[in-house]
From Swiss-Prot:
One of its GO terms (biological process) is cytochrome complex assembly. This is Cytochrome b6-f complex subunit 8. Pfam families: PetN. The gene is petN. InterPro entries: Cytochr_b6-f_cplx_su8_sf, Cytochrome_b6-f_cplx_su8. It comes from Trieres chinensis (Marine centric diatom).
Amino acid sequence: MDIISLGWAGLMTMFTFSLALVVWARNGF
């Protein structure tokens, strides 16, 4: 696994996590 694919995996994980936090915040947890 090279550094670029690893970076993309981390970026997608952070994006999905932040998106889930926004949805949870809108629903009032």
